[in-house]
Amino acid sequence: MGLFFDVLSAINNPNQQGSVTQLESITNSIQQLATSRGIQPSQMQTVMSVLGNVLRPALQKQQSTLGGNQLQNLIGQAIGTSASASGLQSLMSPQLQQQIVQTVSQRTGLSPNAIQAALPTLTSAVMGLLNMGTTKPGVSGSNSILSTFLDSDRDGDTDLGDVLRFANRFLNPSAI
């Protein structure tokens, strides 16, 4: 739940870019994708967990190569291209994309073609979530959400599937 608490903190912090509207947009895009592809909510939660576990080391490597600010800029640019293949390729090599497709497919039972088709939308949603911790222009500071995600000690506090589940509960308390 640690990462979700950072999301809530970013929403409540006037110096960070996170908002309830952003969180709703991210969860809605994931829900629409799941509905259009016939993916059950529990299966989508698993998809997000696996995606986060595969993306984390790739982003950690980029952070060590490029530096934290450059990684943040790259994430911002990828979001700006919306769920497009070019935005995806700016963050991940085709080899990494293929690894993600295979890993998610193996762990969820979804077809590789379904994962490949969903990957730009899913990655855009993850990057949007990670970008919510960015400080507003003119304010110094680091992205707390991205830092928490990358500095994970693998205790489960940064599971993107859990973040999706808690976000849905937060946004739709009557649906619990």
Residue ranges of each PLM-predicted region?
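A structural "flexibility-hinge" signal
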Residues: M1-I176
